């Protein structure tokens, strides 16, 4: 297991690589290049510069999150083949610089959705939350909230240039139901996985967040059955999963422990986001993102890590999101301090599992 933290790049992240390098047990960075629009090829010189900058700080770059998928692919438009070819070229370019895993999602319009990016806890820390009654009927209101909250840093999946086209996107997706989205997903996977096999990269899809339909948009990565379908539609180790414990557990019907155990055992989880959530009494699916320690949330983090350890997990992990604590401000979910605490906690659980199984 190799602990990592997400980093958005020196021009898009207030957290410094030197600070990440000081977090005990964190060996690598999950990198991205935020200003390359979906559908365009990632140039080799940009990848090389990113890798060299990270390695100069004493960290590794083995995982990229995310190489966004153009909506024409998800919708199934005739232009999709052009964007798929571009995606293949990006895969080849990333592999040339030692990238092993690409985390991505296949969600229409919104890459993730929360009702509150500044939810106050009793200790006055701030976190992200989802309360169904607070989700407006008009998706533009959600966009306005996000853009007001992101300060000087855009949020991943909510890039301004994409959100400016949101009305047109909803119109474009109006005839895309779950069956059609699944067909388009299969088309994409069948096209790119042979390239991944050639160059040694694993495509690891992130579960839908939340894992159920919103605004009438379909979801196809929402439960164990969907993950099984994905693995079987192209049966290859290169066709993999980023198991996000927070996202998959947002639907209480999903048994995150069994899902983790099964797909680690099947060698389909090269990358994991491990975070805790706390369900609220206001509704069955209402929650906030809790501190990582088990007792503060609704998930048993030891049980999650044990499911990974017992079934031979040998991939990359990151603590995913954190609260804003100790007066820190910045991109919601991506401050330094609470993620550092989460990484240390998860590393401690892993060390305990290793030593009790010697």
Swiss-Prot record:
Keywords: Iron, Lyase, Manganese. Gene3D superfamilies: Divalent-metal-dependent TIM barrel enzymes. It catalyses: D-mannonate = 2-dehydro-3-deoxy-D-gluconate + H2O. InterPro entries: Man_deHydtase, Xyl_isomerase-like_sf. Its cofactor is Fe(2+); Mn(2+). SUPFAM superfamilies: Xylose isomerase-like. It holds the Pfam family UxuA. The keyword Iron applies. Pathway: Carbohydrate metabolism; pentose and glucuronate interconversion. GO terms for biological process: D-glucuronate catabolic process. Its EC number is 4.2.1.8. It comes from the Bacteria. GO terms for molecular function: ferrous iron binding; manganese ion binding; mannonate dehydratase activity. Catalyzes the dehydration of D-mannonate. Belongs to the mannonate dehydratase family. This is Mannonate dehydratase. The lineage of its organism: Bacteria, Bacillati, Bacillota, Bacilli, Lactobacillales. The gene is uxuA.
């Amino acid at each position: 297991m190799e602990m990592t933290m997400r980093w958005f790049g020196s021009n898009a992240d207030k957290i410094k690589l030197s600070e990440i390098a000081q977090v005990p047990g964190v060996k690598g960075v999950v990198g991205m290049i935020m200003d390359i629009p979906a559908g365009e090829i990632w140039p080799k010189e940009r990848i090389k510069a990113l890798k060299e900058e990270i390695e100069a700080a004493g960290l590794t770059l083995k995982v990229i999150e995310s190489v966004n998928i153009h909506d024409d692919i998800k919708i199934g438009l005739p232009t999709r083949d052009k964007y798929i070819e571009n995606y293949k070229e990006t895969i080849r370019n990333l592999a040339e610089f030692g990238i092993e895993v690409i985390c991505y999602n296949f969600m229409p319009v919104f890459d993730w959705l929360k009702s509150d990016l500044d939810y106050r806890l009793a200790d006055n820390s701030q976190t992200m939350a989802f309360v169904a009654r607070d989700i407006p009927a008009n998706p533009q209101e959600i966009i306005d909230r996000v853009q007001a909250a992101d300060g000087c840093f855009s949020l991943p999946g909510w890039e301004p240039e994409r959100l400016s086209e949101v009305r047109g996107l909803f119109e474009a997706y109006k005839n895309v139901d779950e069956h059609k989205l699944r067909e388009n997903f299969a088309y994409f996977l069948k096209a790119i996985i042979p390239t991944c096999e050639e160059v040694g990269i694993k495509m690891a899809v992130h579960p839908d967040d939340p894992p159920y339909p919103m605004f009438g948009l379909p979801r196809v990565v929402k439960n164990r059955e969907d993950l099984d379908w994905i693995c079987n539609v192209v049966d290859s180790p290169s066709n993999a999963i980023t198991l996000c414990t927070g996202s998959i557990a947002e639907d209480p019907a999903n048994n995150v422990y069994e899902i983790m155990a099964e797909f680690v055992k099947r060698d389909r989880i090269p990358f994991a986001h491990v975070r805790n959530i706390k369900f609220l009494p206001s509704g069955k699916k209402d929650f906030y993102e809790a501190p990582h320690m088990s007792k503060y949330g609704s998930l048993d983090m030891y049980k999650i890590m044990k499911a990974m350890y017992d079934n031979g997990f040998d991939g990359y992990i990151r603590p995913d999101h954190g609260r804003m604590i100790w007066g820190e401000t910045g991109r919601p979910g991506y401050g330094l301090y609470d993620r550092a605490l989460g990484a240390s906690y998860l590393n401690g659980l892993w060390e305990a599992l290793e030593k009790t199984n010697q």
